[in-house]
Swiss-Prot record:
Effect of residue 50 to T: In DBA13; results in reduced protein expression; results in pre-rRNA processing defect
Keyword Acetylation set for record: yes
Annotated positions of the Omega-N-methylarginine modification: 12
Protein family according to the UniProt entry: Belongs to the universal ribosomal protein uS14 family.
Cofactor notes: Binds 1 zinc ion per subunit.
Record's protein name: Small ribosomal subunit protein uS14
The entry's keywords: Acetylation, Cytoplasm, Diamond-Blackfan anemia, Disease variant, Endoplasmic reticulum, Metal-binding, Methylation, Phosphoprotein, Ribonucleoprotein, Ribosomal protein, Zinc
Residues where Phosphoserine is found: 9
Biological function: Component of the small ribosomal subunit. The ribosome is a large ribonucleoprotein complex responsible for the synthesis of proteins in the cell.
Compartment(s): Cytoplasm, Cytosol; Cytoplasm; Rough endoplasmic reticulum
Main location: cytoplasm
Record organism: Homo sapiens
Cystine bridges: none
Keyword Acetylation assigned: yes
UniProt gene name: RPS29
Length: 56
């Protein structure tokens, strides 16, 4: 079995490796609440466009 056959061959159906940001495909700092599926950096960038407002 060569490297090409083994690389990323394990099924990723659940867990952190199965989910990624819909904008930048990052896997860290993911916000899944309300079905956002965005990393926190992209959420900060697009929050106003989505309709989130910052409360004091």
């Amino acid at each position: 079995m060569g490297h090409q056959q083994l690389y990323w061959s394990h099924p990723r159906k659940f867990g952190q490796g199965s989910r990624s940001c819909r904008v930048c495909s990052n896997r860290h700092g993911l916000i899944r609440k309300y079905g956002l599926n965005m990393c926190r950096q992209c959420f900060r960038q697009y929050a106003k466009d989505i309709g989130f407002i910052k409360l004091d």
